[in-house]
Amino acid sequence: MMTLTFASPPQNKSDLETGPAFTPRFDEKGLITAVVTDAGDGALLMVAHMNAEALALTLETGVAHYYSRSRRRLWKKGESSGNVQAVREIRTDCDQDAIWLKVSVAGHDATCHTGRRSCFYRTVGVDEGQAKLVITDDERHFDLKQVYAES
């Protein structure tokens, strides 16, 4: 159960950008974008969303929680796979409408539900006038059927 609450963002832009209060600016759906990188090597792992409850739980527990837009529910990262994200640092951008989590991943060291370390395992390019995807990291850190069958 969350106990932390967030004050409304200040009207004064200077206070928002340089003041000491963390006053996240959630969008019209009550969400804030979270960029997640590895605390050790800086690799981009995922982009997700948090509602106030997920953000509060993350701050209170030190474990990353997100809001799933597709499932419309709170989710503790790694609750099914065991790849829990321990939060080492949280930063916010200048206008406090996005956050950056630096995490250490437990379990199989995989963040993506596909079993890969990162959700960003493909590059985007153009081939013969068509946008194409190329897989650049095809290493699976765990067996999907085994891990998700256990949950």
Swiss-Prot record:
Catalytic activity entry: 1-(5-phospho-beta-D-ribosyl)-5'-AMP + H2O = 1-(5-phospho-beta-D-ribosyl)-5-[(5-phospho-beta-D-ribosylamino)methylideneamino]imidazole-4-carboxamide
InterPro entries the record matches: PRA-CH (IPR026660), PRib_AMP_CycHydrolase_dom (IPR002496), PRib_AMP_CycHydrolase_sf (IPR038019)
Cofactor detail note: Binds 1 Mg(2+) ion per subunit.
EC number: 3.5.4.19
Binding of Mg(2+), residues: 93, 95, 97
Single biological process term from Gene Ontology: L-histidine biosynthetic process
Segments of this protein annotated with the region Disordered: 1-20
Enzyme superclass (EC): hydrolase
Pathway: Amino-acid biosynthesis; L-histidine biosynthesis; L-histidine from 5-phospho-alpha-D-ribose 1-diphosphate: step 3/9
Cell location: Cytoplasm
Binding site for Zn(2+): 94, 112, 119
Family: Belongs to the PRA-CH family.
Complex and partners: Homodimer.
Function, as annotated: Catalyzes the hydrolysis of the adenine ring of phosphoribosyl-AMP.
UniProt-recorded name of the protein: Phosphoribosyl-AMP cyclohydrolase
Species: Sinorhizobium medicae (strain WSM419)
Species classification: Bacteria, Pseudomonadati, Pseudomonadota, Alphaproteobacteria, Hyphomicrobiales
Name of the gene encoding the protein in the UniProt record: hisI
